[in-house]
Amino acid sequence: MTTPVLNTDFPGLKLAARGKVRDIYDLGETLLIVTTDRISAFDVIMNEGIPHKGYVLTQISAYWFRQMEGIIKNHIISTDVADFPKECQPYADVLAGRSMWVKKAQPLAAECIVRGYISGSGWKDYQSTGAICGIKLPEGLKESDRLPQPIFTPSTKAELGTHDENISFEEMCRICGTEISTKVRDVTLAIYEKARDIADQKGIIIADTKFEYGIYEGELIIIDECMTPDSSRFWPKDSYKPGGPQPSFDKQFLRDYLETLDWGKTAPAPPLPEEIVRKTGEKYMEALVKLTGKGI
């Protein structure tokens, strides 16, 4: 099995942040985002990485960013290492395929979730309240049902190791401002509807997904990642059957395994068997091939 890239360390480059998956380097006016093979579940980073996961996430994000350019601009300057600043070139072998040279935007203080199907925390909320983030839904929905129309459900941005909290659209307006929140909501729904139709033709259901936005030179742009198996629920269309959980092309497979363990969902993470690592990697790769027609 290929050795995963768990951490990066590039002498001469300033490490600005190390998140659950991405290492971010400050290049002055721009940023270098390196997507590692780290994987987290329940907000805990696993000890093992998933080989090629960083490559898959970067390529899927780049694919969707290109598809959505008619709706909103994104933060990418280039994904071709040859275009990166000269101080990045000594590390080209590690950076190739798993990194982005991006604009330095001011992130909005909310994460923007759109749900086209009822699953996960949304399903739990619906069971107890009949609503998600205060949005009342029809009675009688089953787990994994398609919603009558997609809904926008923002959340707070949590610190590393803590959980995001769902908030109402009205609360987002108080945090970010009504004008920008309304634009973000409209753009998020437009992106989702276009992506849902594209993915449907490729045999994938995008049940829900999460976006991050920023302001760059006074303009709203989309940043971070875009509709990857880390930020989305991807279900195989050919086996879709409402009334329960769905098989998926994302890390739900890993979550399901962890749910079978006597583990409190706090660090340290339990060791992952090689089979779980391999099968998780296969699901990520399958999503890339189905969407883009290309593998490694």
Curated annotation (Swiss-Prot):
Pathway: Purine metabolism; IMP biosynthesis via de novo pathway; 5-amino-1-(5-phospho-D-ribosyl)imidazole-4-carboxamide from 5-amino-1-(5-phospho-D-ribosyl)imidazole-4-carboxylate: step 1/2. SUPFAM superfamilies: SAICAR synthase-like. InterPro entries: SAICAR_synt/ADE2_N, SAICAR_synth. One of its GO terms (biological process) is 'de novo' IMP biosynthetic process. Its EC number is 6.3.2.6. Pfam families: SAICAR_synt. It comes from the Bacteria. It is an enzyme of class 6 (ligase). The keyword Iron does not apply. The keyword Ligase applies. GO terms for molecular function: ATP binding; phosphoribosylaminoimidazolesuccinocarboxamide synthase activity. It catalyses: 5-amino-1-(5-phospho-D-ribosyl)imidazole-4-carboxylate + L-aspartate + ATP = (2S)-2-[5-amino-1-(5-phospho-beta-D-ribosyl)imidazole-4-carboxamido]succinate + ADP + phosphate + 2 H(+). Keywords: ATP-binding, Ligase, Nucleotide-binding, Purine biosynthesis. One of its GO terms (cellular component) is cytoplasm. Belongs to the SAICAR synthetase family. NCBIfam families: PRK13961.1 (NF010568), purC (TIGR00081). This is Phosphoribosylaminoimidazole-succinocarboxamide synthase. The gene is purC.
